């Protein structure tokens, strides 16, 4: 089979399963509204959970940062790309989340890959929730360590896997809020079992940070756990992009030596770090509290109105509200019908989610209004 034949076969298989991914160019894709092809849609597909992507203070901070530092960092943080703006953001994040150190990364994917590949060796074992994000599972699969997956949120299964002999160290990997189901991990129980077997815990809280907990401190703070490795991202609750790893002084120094994604990547622009500092200030403020309260009310309104639809509603109290349809074609058809009626919704299909669980992944944001939720419910009931 030639290269072209290999490529064609893979694409044909995706088309046959109604699983071919496509991108849609949009004029505006974050916040309450999505604009595409000169039409405005209510946006139920973005992860801008607090509606901060268009916040004037954050935009102003980015502009001022660009004027001060330029539009790029100029290199890796190990060369010339680590600015006082990066340093200030790291210090503020560490203080906010109760860690000694924070290290910035250009994306959550890069942060997860960097940590897992740097921390584990051949004699070690990674025990990951089966529904962990692709960045976590891919890194674990590519690492020299042994990978074992436990049934989603099943602490008893996790304990059995940890109890089997391992010549090296064990790293337990999970998420705070799961990206496709919107449910939360039982972090306190997971941490307890991990500690009983002398392992370390790594939590990716991409979808919880900024959105839940006191001052938006996220899933771990809310559940009173302190994992050895906490990954937070800035493309969701923060409304920007990028990520950080929270850890001890020793682990931070170790990652600075061995995390190749950190060492060999151009660091985020200092102007972006300034924007993230402004976003963090909003998240920690009374305004941040108000946005979280509004989002919670919108979620309650949606869940109350969707109960009698002929879909499976995931057990989620987060901004991620999946309606599980099952069939790929049906999910695509529903998404298209909703778009025709002014609601931009995305169909998520395998391999992103398990086979037979194609869904409409609905996401709510504090930028929405109650009438937006009512309109979504009206359209869903008309197409259920």
Curated annotation (Swiss-Prot):
Record-linked Gene3D superfamilies: Aspartate Aminotransferase, domain 1, Type I PLP-dependent aspartate aminotransferase-like (Major domain)
Keyword set for this entry?
Answer: Biotin biosynthesis, Pyridoxal phosphate, Transferase
Task: Please list the cofactors this protein needs.
Answer: pyridoxal 5'-phosphate
- Check the record and name the InterPro entries matching this protein: Aminotrans_II_pyridoxalP_BS (IPR001917), Aminotransferase_I/II_large (IPR004839), AON_synthase_class-II (IPR050087), AONS_Archaea/Proteobacteria (IPR004723), AONS_Proteobacteria (IPR022834), PyrdxlP-dep_Trfase (IPR015424), PyrdxlP-dep_Trfase_major (IPR015421), PyrdxlP-dep_Trfase_small (IPR015422)
Which pathway, metabolic or otherwise, does it act in?
Cofactor biosynthesis; biotin biosynthesis
Domain of life, source organism: Bacteria
Residues bound to substrate are 21, 133, 352
Q: What is its EC number?
A: 2.3.1.47
From which residue to which does the signal peptide run?
A: none
CDD domains recorded: KBL_like
| Keyword Transferase (UniProt) | yes
| Pfam families the record matches | Aminotran_1_2
**Catalytic activities:** 6-carboxyhexanoyl-[ACP] + L-alanine + H(+) = (8S)-8-amino-7-oxononanoate + holo-[ACP] + CO2
GO MF annotations, alphabetized = 8-amino-7-oxononanoate synthase activity; pyridoxal phosphate binding
Q: What class of enzyme is it?
A: transferase
Any idea which residues bear N6-(pyridoxal phosphate)lysine here? 236
* Residue numbers binding pyridoxal 5'-phosphate: 108-109, 179, 207, 233
The record's comment on protein family reads:
Belongs to the class-II pyridoxal-phosphate-dependent aminotransferase family. BioF subfamily.
- Entry's HAMAP family? BioF_aminotrans_2
Quaternary data: Homodimer.
Q: What is this protein called?
A: 8-amino-7-oxononanoate synthase
Name the source organism.
Escherichia coli O17:K52:H18 (strain UMN026 / ExPEC)
